[in-house]
Amino acid sequence: MGSLRIKHSGQVFTPDYLVADILDFCGYVESPRILGKHIIDNSCGEGAFLCEIVGRYCRAFRAGNDDIALLKDELQTYIHGIEIDAGTYERCIENLNLVVLKFGVIDVDWDIIEGNALKIKIYDGAMDFVVGNPPYVRVHNLETDYTDVKQFTFANGGMTDLFLVFFELGLRMLSAGGRLCYITPSSWLNSLAGESMRREIVLRKYLTGVVDMGHFQPFKATTYTLISRFEKVEDNDRIDYNVYDERVGKIRHIDTLSYDEIQINRKFYLSGKKELELLKRIRLSASDSYVRVKNGFATLFDDVFIGELPFMEYTIPVLKASTGKWSRAFFPYDEKGSPLTYELLSECESVCRYLED
């Protein structure tokens, strides 16, 4: 996909393995429990989410019922989508038809709307599940007038991004007890643009789970990403904090956090309880007795220089300001700040193996 298309339309298509993980995290799993439940992808693209959804629905239905006519009727009733681009919309319909053909279903009158999701209200309060990968595009890059964007509460702060509006749109579509699950940039956790959204989250307490993708980059568009799960339930104060383990391609649970634990100065931070407690003491204390910052620096290649390094030589402790997480950084410099020679580094076998890999 061209960079201009990403910049102006925000279309970034989702890999199949992530689609499956997101649906699982949302609770839309292949079982009788999803039958008769309304689900929508309100920026459905070519149907990455909808194709997996339809496949799961068909398999769950056929496990206990061979009535193809009834299956067709339920697909037309419970599966929904919206796509603004005409060509992409047509490819979505074609892809969905190919999926149901495997189950002996033809001529489905899909409830997929070609249109602007920001102007469509027929799904408000009616969805059991809202899922997807909403468009990432700053309002000043929109190809059309962004007055539709600015009417949303979540757009009232900073240089807003379209995906923030889709959070508000998705929550509006949920019925009582419904679930929303998106993969988006993680910037809403602490950006000025995300302040209105965070304020609403604290008020309603709909956020129930996150998956921090960390340095793993599932898209060509370079950005830190996060899977967020919201549920329209009352009296919730539990947020499941997970990370994505790219080594095994699985979501791994780290901790269960409260709303108080993730908030510092009206911003959200994600980590384990101990790390968050330390970060809160640092951020809220007027004293510098906890941590003295000697230097701030940018590596421009965190995947190599920062993380769980397989050696201790030539490393220093670092605190990542954006996340509040402690780690270690490869620091191949002497006390005067001069780079160490290759000959000196070569004396440490573990460092050599790491750099060669």
Residue ranges with predicted function:
Residues 1-210, 215, 227-229, 233-238:
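SAM-dependent methyltransferase catalytic region
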Residues 72, 220-223:
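Short coil/turn motifs at beta-sheet boundaries
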Residues 219, 226-357:
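C-terminal substrate-recognition regions of SAM-dependent nucleic acid methyltransferases
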